Amino acid sequence: WSGSYTYLVGNKPAIRAGFGILYQGSRYTGNTTNTTDKIQTHYFAPQFSLHWLKQQFDWYFTTGTGYQLYKDDSMVYDKPRKVSMNKWAANFGIGGEYHLFTHWGISARISYILAYSGEYSVRYHHKEWMVQPHYPMNGSDDISQLSFSAGINYHF
């Protein structure tokens, strides 16, 4: 799920800058033989965007940096495990919108949130550890997200 608000500067058609805020959240549940994962992420970030407006079309690029909250409540060999990785992250996105009416439009967007775990906390079997990857930024500590969304927009 996601939500965003953008304020466009100026009133000329063509290319316009925008400022706003982005929220994006996700939930994943998975099971294997001895493990059950319940992962939730929440991302909040101020945004800067460039919009190319042409008649009823709006093509845009967005970027921002914010904070990603990551929580994993799992069961491993019938014992609870909690992982917390709350980190700074950055996002990039491209999208487009077709304006059906004055206040309504349909849109699609591809977004990427770039985040690495770095050091994080694991609580398992009544003990807590701080974990630090041996090889940072080689992919094993990647908690990034790629998403595609489509929807109906209302313009105030």
Question: At which residue positions do the language-model features occur?
Answer:
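Gram-negative (and chloroplast) outer-membrane scaffold detector with strong preference
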Residues: 4-90, 98-104, 143-156
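Predominantly the C-terminal beta-signal and adjacent terminal strand-loop region
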Residues: 92, 100-156
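Conserved alpha-helical elements of sugar-nucleotide-dependent glycosyltransferases
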Residues: 1
